[in-house]
Amino acid sequence: MAKNTRKKDDKKLPKVSYYCKPDNLTLKQWQIALRRQTAEKENFAIFEHNTKDSPGYYSVVNSVTKNEYRVVYRGEESVWNYCSCMDFKTSQLGSCKHLEAVKLWISRNHRKIYAGRPSYTSLYLSYKKKKKICLRIGTD
């Protein structure tokens, strides 16, 4: 079922400036905070895929543009997190507003984070720091 990322009773976090990096944040932390802030403002619909067959897989739909993005979230620092958007692929942060929206949705809905290794083996492109091809061995 679709869930929005915004709630009326949410407590507001301190606003992060788009123009000046706060002294208490690294450049990476600042950029991720900006994406989290954008995720809080935008009205995304989040669909969780079949948790038995595809644990950790989500679809994020922008309610204004109707663009849909595939997101895989396996935990805060997981190397297997992924989003199909260009920001995720080019920023080398390992995050984007869609991934941040999923994290907010999981937190607000008290959902379980699937941090386990998938059963299948795959060859994938890692977008963190620098692009590299990686092999993930599945559990089967």
Residue spans of the language-model regions?
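Long, low-complexity, compositionally biased intrinsically disordered regions
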Residues: 1-140
